[in-house]
Design a protein with these regions (language model features):
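Active-site-proximal helix/loop microenvironment
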Residues: 171-190
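Periplasmic/cell-envelope proteins involved in peptidoglycan metabolism and beta-lactam response
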Residues: 1-86, 90-92, 103-107, 159-168, ...
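Short active-site loop/helix that positions an aromatic residue
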Residues: 99-100
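Active-site proximal loops enriched in glycine and acidic residues that flank catalytic Cys/His/Asp
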Residues: 55, 63-66, 116, 153-154, ...
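Penicillin-binding protein/beta-lactamase superfamily catalytic region
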Residues: 8-12, 22, 150, 154, ...
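Alpha-helical transmembrane segments of multi-pass membrane proteins
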Residues: 91-94, 143
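Short beta-alpha connecting loops at secondary-structure transitions
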Residues: 77-83, 121-130, 181-184
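Conserved catalytic neighborhood of penicillin-recognizing serine enzymes
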Residues: 1, 5, 9, 57, ...
Length: 190
């Protein structure tokens, strides 16, 4: 079946239509479905992949691969991961550092300590659970270090980060009635 996630989304969102037209490129869609399937299989049994290609000039969706294999139940293939709420992980770190630069709190060569640090009850760790001592902001970002990012967010303020994210058109999902915490630096938001 061609582009099952895109087809299902179109029919679900416009059930009154008898004819549904999609802007997908058949060739690109087929290539990306194959690519997603091959890469997910190479990464492991429970790994999936999703791809959404949009023409920035027209807004047309050229390819919509919602999972690595629609029929693979072990990979939850029927779930369209292009629309699923996901943690942003480390993708917010450049925004955090950018806010610090704008506020004059830091610049790329500012030294920051990558050492075990507690913020009240919160004690973030690096992905590899190692510490690098004094590093520049540039190095911290290049190595996606968690502790420096949380330290900078502590100086900038989580609310300011959330405001910036909203200003670029993204509505973060926070636990109801909770203020953003330092955990948002590491993707503690959907």
């Amino acid at each position: 079946r061609f582009a099952p996630h895109a087809s299902e989304t179109e029919v679900r969102e416009r059930p009154h239509r008898n004819l549904h037209r999609l802007t997908l490129s058949r060739e690109l869609q087929a290539q990306l479905e194959t690519l997603a399937r091959e890469h997910a299989r190479a990464l492991g049994r429970r790994i999936s992949a999703a791809v959404l290609v949009v023409d920035n000039h027209t807004g047309e969706i050229l390819a919509h691969v919602g999972s690595s294999d629609y029929l693979d139940e072990a990979r939850f293939g029927a779930i369209d991961m292009t629309g699923a709420i996901r943690s942003p992980g480390s993708t917010l770190k450049p925004i955090i550092y950018g806010l610090a630069f704008e506020a004059g709190l830091a610049h790329p060569e500012t030294l920051i300590e990558d050492r075990p640090t507690r913020f009240g009850q919160y004690a973030p760790k690096n992905f590899d659970e190692d510490f690098r001592g004094s590093v520049t902001i540039r190095e911290a970002l290049a190595h996606s270090l968690n502790i420096p990012a949380v330290k900078v967010l502590n100086a900038v303020g989580p609310a300011r980060l959330i405001a910036r994210i909203r200003s670029i058109g993204v509505e973060p999902v926070l636990p109801s009635h909770e203020q953003p915490s330092l955990a948002v630096a590491l993707g503690g938001v959907g």
